[in-house]
């Protein structure tokens, strides 16, 4: 998993509340057994004018020019600004996969659905909860200023505006450690690989009957 320490990026303001995971990545794309390839289908039903299908060449599809992610000024955005209850709905992990693959590193909102919030940390995506009035301020600035960027510092737990004003945010210490060091569940387990191997050796020596061939 890619570590997150500090990131400065273009902000895309998605001014919609209660964005659910089916809107983030529609159900027809969940058939894939891989965790890659979802970026082109992020917000598929909003980004395109046709109905998307798995393995479709999205470069040939008609774009919805009224959707914010398609505005030329927000191309290359890596910080998503959202409204309350972002990521609600089903627990599909494909939602943070699609956001991360598109290029988003952080999402700022007044609140997140719990499962989406947890899944984001496990996939290198930083969900940041700010006060509603702070999010309102950021929406006003991002919509008024082309090329608007924010700097997110996970170690310091701050979001910094271009004018220098900072907002602090809370994050669980364990999640912070994992994201700073790029550790997902597998990475955490592999840190104890030698201890696991040693246990397996001791276990096989102390209870060899468990490892005998079945006749």
Curated annotation (Swiss-Prot):
Q: Name one GO biological process term.
A: L-leucine biosynthetic process
Report the EC number(s), separated by commas if there are several: 4.2.1.33
Q: Which UniProt keywords apply?
A: Amino-acid biosynthesis, Branched-chain amino acid biosynthesis, Leucine biosynthesis, Lyase
Query: What's the domain of life for this entry?
Result: Bacteria
Record's keyword annotation contains Lyase: yes
Pathway in which the depicted protein is active: Amino-acid biosynthesis; L-leucine biosynthesis; L-leucine from 3-methyl-2-oxobutanoate: step 2/4
Q: What class of enzyme is it?
A: lyase
Q: Does the keyword Amino-acid biosynthesis apply?
A: yes
Q: Which reaction does it catalyse?
A: (2R,3S)-3-isopropylmalate = (2S)-2-isopropylmalate
Example of a GO MF term? 3-isopropylmalate dehydratase activity
Pfam families reported for this sequence: Aconitase_C
Give coiled-coil spans as residue ranges.
Answer: none
The membrane-spanning stretches of this chain are none
List the GO cellular component terms. Answer: 3-isopropylmalate dehydratase complex
Function field: Catalyzes the isomerization between 2-isopropylmalate and 3-isopropylmalate, via the formation of 2-isopropylmaleate.
Q: Family, per the entry?
A: Belongs to the LeuD family. LeuD type 1 subfamily.
Q: How does it assemble?
A: Heterodimer of LeuC and LeuD.
What this protein is called in its record is 3-isopropylmalate dehydratase small subunit
Origin organism lineage: Bacteria, Pseudomonadati, Pseudomonadota, Gammaproteobacteria, Pseudomonadales
Name of the gene encoding the protein in the UniProt record = leuD
